[in-house]
Amino acid sequence: MTTYGVIGAAQARPVTLVVCRGCCCGNPRKHPGSDHAWQLDRLYAAAADSGGQFTVRTTDCLGPCDQANVIVVQPSGEGRRRGGRATWIGWAMGDAATDDIVRWAADGGPGIAEPPPTLELQFIRPPGEVRKRARGRGRARR
């Protein structure tokens, strides 16, 4: 008998918040007025209280350091099937931004729930997309 495993977007997986804690994000020297430890604690606590609706993980530098703190909201498996894609959020500091991110993730995240309008103002392009757009400018190759 042959068995098949489910892989990729077909898997049941929760929304994932990827929190940059590289060279600039989470660095109190760069943003001394922000409580970076509190933000991470708040995200972890909210994920624990979400009943598995979303998870949090940290990573090294994601790239757009001039827009720190950066959080990437990755869609759940169902959100991905419905067309949701990873959403990059810049300048994600303070209570209001953190609460908006938690609320959106708890509501289902990309592909499932609409983001809070104030959070949409903080959406940024992923570094790879910015590089692709920059390469498209200038003289055409022959």
Label every PLM stretch briefly:
Residues 1-26, 140-142:
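Polybasic, low-complexity association/targeting segments
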Residues 4-6, 43-44, 73-78:
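Intrinsically disordered, low-complexity boundary segments flanking structured domains
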Residues 7-19, 41-64:
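Immediate flanking context of iron-sulfur cluster ligation sites
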Residues 17-31, 57-76:
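Local cysteine-cluster metal-coordination motifs and their immediate loop/turn environment
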Residues 26-42:
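Compact Cys/His-rich
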Residues 67-142:
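Short flanking/linker segments adjacent to small metal-binding domains or redox-active Cys/His motifs
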